[in-house]
Amino acid sequence: TILQDFTKVVKLINESRFLFDSFQFRFRNYATISGNFDHWHIDYVKLDEFLNSTDTIQLDDVSFVYPSPSFLKRYFEMPWTHFVNNEIMELKDSIDINLRNNGASTNVDYQYNVFENSNQIFHYPLIGLSRNVSVLDYDSIGNFSFTNPPISIETNVFNSFQLDSATFIVQNIIGTASSDYKYNDTIYHTQKFHTYFAYDDGVAESAYGINIDGAKLAYEFKLNRPDTLRAVQMYFPQMLDSVNHIPFDLTIWAKTNGLPGTILYSESFSPVHTEYLDYHTYYLSQPFRIVGDFYVGWQQTTDDLLNIGLDKNNTANSYMYYDAGFGWTNSSYNGSWMIRPIFSMN
């Protein structure tokens, strides 16, 4: 089954062989090893006495339930040289933060701060220390959403004197009652502006592949100024069988009538399986200049599943295309491929 929400489970530990000082326990899952399947998460673990199997008491807690979102409208990350002077076009007007309240309805204070090199350069809200909101309990409304009004983003939120790249830390904080569980009241994300474009957040919850010889996969990107494509980063998660001996044609297409058109570049490579979610960088033998919109992807030379990493927390389907022999079509699998083109003028 596919479960999208947490469910509560009560396990009684009442056998004498467990009732001793320094008792320990662990959780183990049974999973399919042929792919990124059977993922599950443990949220709260409460060990207490005098509970029974029908106990419904939960931890009194208000917490963040999703990662801190990117402030960019189209990409998760992008080059600094393409962001500067295009802030209005590239930044979201607002973001949404979801909270879950396991206890009774309560008021919480929310704020976010932006740091560069440990120096705070921006604070939300613009007036006052924090924004106070009433968060109803989860059983009444589900997750609380900051939609009325949303959390605003100003065009000067990322202000830096750096010329080529910049890195910012975004800190989200909720202020709750002193009795509230405190280890999940702050979340961070790093907003990077380096040399690559990325729709993904760097974590593969799944994988995507086409097992058809000659099939093509193309990912759309847009440049705000002419630039030189020097490399492409890809993340191929290790599945049941290694495919690092199977070649594919890394391909760059021009945009023609809204779809991949003329091939601008093609070079043969093979998947490289890395550890710890590290991307492998494919350096082009002949870097070349690109203007405007283009596509990055590959053409298959076999019917093997190459399986590019798929980030399911960020959806970029409108920029993801495949051609299995019947023309270009948008991918119907929600997520974003873990493919990142790298640019620099030098």
Describe the role of every protein-language-model region.
Residues 20, 223-233, 245, 291:
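Extended extracellular/luminal ectodomain segments enriched in beta-structured repeat modules
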Residues 227-240, 298:
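A short beta-strand element within beta-rich, extracytoplasmic domains
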Residues 1-121:
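Beta-sandwich/jellyroll recognition modules and their flexible linkers
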Residues 38-44, 299-345:
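Short, surface-exposed beta-strand/loop patches at domain edges
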Residues 242-318:
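Aromatic- and Gly/Pro-enriched, solvent-exposed loop/edge beta-strand patches characteristic
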Residues 1-20, 128-143, 259-281:
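Exoplasmic/lumenal beta-rich domain surfaces
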Residues 7-10, 211-223, 279-280:
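Short beta-strands within extracellular/lumenal beta-sheet-rich domains
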Residues 43-53, 174-221:
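Short beta-strand elements
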